[in-house]
Amino acid sequence: MSGQMFKVEIVTRPANFEKLKQELGKIGVTSLTFSNVHGCGLQKAHTELYRGVKIESNVYERLKIEIVVSKVPVDQVTETAKRVLKTGSPGDGKIFVYEISNTINIRTGEEGPEAL
């Protein structure tokens, strides 16, 4: 197994997902996983209507995007995400970078960067 692998996890507002996906494609990111999540942080509480009752909440909808790269430099992925997602306001999100020790393709049995 050769080649270093990294997982980039981005938690951000869902609004710019399509733009981010497009820009990541331009640098060679061919696949990613995303899921809807909820979170709270520095943003102020907002008022929601729940079953006819107004409630204040500091929980916001977010998107978690997971990308594992080997051939694409991880710095390019993080710089692209920062460029696309930064508004300068609380709630822009966070980027986490992890080293990956192995990847296994269940269907083919390939391991390491070849499994990506």
Swiss-Prot record:
Pfam families: P-II
GO biological process, one term: regulation of nitrogen utilization
Glycosyltransferase among keywords: no
InterPro entries, A to Z: N-reg_PII, N-reg_PII-like_a/b, N-reg_PII/ATP_PRibTrfase_C, N-reg_PII_CS
GO annotation, cellular component aspect: cytosol; plasma membrane
Protein localization: Cell membrane
Superkingdom, natural source: Bacteria
Coiled-coil regions, chain positions: none
Membrane topology term: Peripheral membrane protein
Reported phenotype of the disruption mutant: Cells show no growth phenotype even at acidic pH.
GO molecular function, one term: ATP binding
Induction comment: The nrgAB operon is activated by TnrA under nitrogen-limited conditions.
Annotated keywords: Activator, Cell membrane, Membrane, Transcription, Transcription regulation
Main subcellular location: membrane
Similarity field: Belongs to the P(II) protein family.
UniProt subunit comment: Needs to interact with NrgA in order to localize correctly to the membrane.
Function according to Swiss-Prot or TrEMBL: Required for full induction of the nrgAB operon under conditions of ammonium limitation.
Family matches, as PANTHER family: NITROGEN REGULATORY PROTEIN P-II (PTHR30115), NITROGEN REGULATORY PROTEIN P-II HOMOLOG (PTHR30115:SF11)
Protein name in UniProt: Nitrogen regulatory PII-like protein
Provenance organism: Bacillus subtilis (strain 168)
